[in-house]
């Protein structure tokens, strides 16, 4: 069973946006502040806990279950490891590429953890979820009411914003039935022009906040190469302070909202306003016409 006092959060975002890196650095800072945390990796790459564990990839629930024959044959200590500052780490895993549903690993892992008492003596459970909300399996932490606070990692790049809007749409779908809410956008900077202003504008349109702007800093990559969080690798760095600031904001966050996703033309108008997308009027002679008609 799950303690009702636990705050269950999830980090979503476009693939490659730096979601796992951002979440682990932020959760490490939260652990430094005395929060008791468990990370449940919901990505078949199983990279949601590697900075916490100083490892390439943790053995996943699905992988071990396949070896043993059934998830019921596993022991909790085999799949839940302890990392930096006592953070508990689990990776759900997924099937071989092209075979089966990766969302099944999330469902199997969470059920196993609940049935074996993993959710006891915790302040936060964090789900690190693959990419966009592309299927019901990956939306499972939202759909089943597991994750109550969603943080979307995005940037001022066009596809990251498209993904953020789609994720907001997924949250809205389950907000009334499951009680899930959007906690805010985390801008993981790509040094796009007017990036902070753009993401604040996007957040306002989505009825949420830009909870923090994480500047780009090479020290993040230096720490990653050593399989460490910034907080452990360079605790006195400016970037470490940024993650601590974000951690504090999440701990104290009470602005949990039902998002208002944008229609595609509204989102594209925002992108045009900030110069990320060409104005279609410049190409009106070909827009909307069959390809053969524009040769």
Swiss-Prot record:
Broad enzyme group: oxidoreductase
Species of provenance: Nostoc sp. (strain PCC 7120 / SAG 25.82 / UTEX 2576)
InterPro entries: NifH/chlL_CS (IPR030655), NifH/frxC (IPR000392), Nitrogenase_Fe_NifH (IPR005977), P-loop_NTPase (IPR027417)
Location of ADP-ribosylarginine modifications: 104
Family designation: Belongs to the NifH/BchL/ChlL family.
GO molecular function: 4 iron, 4 sulfur cluster binding; ATP binding; metal ion binding; nitrogenase activity
HAMAP family linked to this entry: NifH
Gene: nifH1
UniProt remark on cofactor binding: Binds 1 [4Fe-4S] cluster per dimer.
Pfam families assigned: Fer4_NifH
E.C. number: 1.18.6.1
GO process terms (BP): nitrogen fixation
Gene3D superfamilies found in the cross-reference section: P-loop containing nucleotide triphosphate hydrolases (3.40.50.300)
Protein name: Nitrogenase iron protein 1
Assembly and interaction partners: Homodimer.
Binding site for ATP: 13-20
Cofactors named for this entry: [4Fe-4S] cluster
Record keywords, A-Z: 4Fe-4S, ADP-ribosylation, ATP-binding, Iron, Iron-sulfur, Metal-binding, Nitrogen fixation, Nucleotide-binding, Oxidoreductase
Catalytic activity: N2 + 8 reduced [2Fe-2S]-[ferredoxin] + 16 ATP + 16 H2O = H2 + 8 oxidized [2Fe-2S]-[ferredoxin] + 2 NH4(+) + 16 ADP + 16 phosphate + 6 H(+)
PTMs per UniProt: The reversible ADP-ribosylation of Arg-104 inactivates the nitrogenase reductase and regulates nitrogenase activity.
SUPFAM superfamilies, sorted: P-loop containing nucleoside triphosphate hydrolases
Residue sites binding [4Fe-4S] cluster per the record: 101, 135
